[in-house]
Design a protein with these regions (language model features):
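Metalloprotease/metallohydrolase-associated module, dominated by Zn2+-dependent proteases
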Residues: 1-30, 34-91, 107-162
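Active-site recognition of the HExxH zinc-binding catalytic motif
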Residues: 95-107
Length: 162
């Protein structure tokens, strides 16, 4: 069975990144957790995962803490694989947390009397590019992607020149 514990090291990194690059998250509740072992998805190791907790699970958190839940309860959770974290360099750790923070969004309603809405965003090319600009090719999968892009550009040039 998978176990989870709080991840203060991830939280420290996230706080700095939020201040620098993700200011829309400054007043958003985020919990940081270690997952004891990495999950896998489609044959790939999952280093981290961003989640939105709302509804019954969010209310249950307040019940366990023995405080009164607000009318609308929602928060984010960043889950990081503790076993894989140990294999990463410090710059890779920062890049991983930055990448996961890119998935956390806040929709501001047009009506002044409406509440903001927390959303999980998919992989966005602009945000992906921003993380690569800030941290470089921090994972082998990103290097593989770059090589594929380079190969495609070479093929396009050959077809254009040929």
């Amino acid at each position: 069975m998978t176990s989870y514990t709080t991840a203060p090291a991830v939280e420290r990194i996230a706080e700095k990144l939020i201040e620098q690059h993700h200011r829309h998250l400054l007043d958003v509740p985020i919990r940081y957790l270690w997952r004891d072992k990495a999950a896998s998805s489609k044959g790939n190791v999952v280093l981290g995962k961003a989640r939105k907790v709302t509804g019954l699970p969010a209310h249950l958190v307040h019940l366990v803490r023995k405080d009164e839940p607000p009318e609308e309860v929602e928060f984010f959770v960043l889950e990081i694989a503790a076993d894989m974290w140990q294999t990463l360099t410090e710059p890779q750790r920062v890049a991983l947390v930055d990448h996961e923070l890119c998935h956390l969004g806040v929709e501001i309603p047009e009506r002044a009397d409406a509440d903001r809405k927390l959303v999980i965003r998919g992989h966005d090319l602009e945000e992906f590019a921003a993380v690569v600009e800030r941290h470089g090719l921090w994972r082998p999968a990103i290097e593989t992607f770059r090589a594929a892009v380079d190969a495609q550009l070479t093929l396009d040039e050959a077809m254009r020149d040929g």
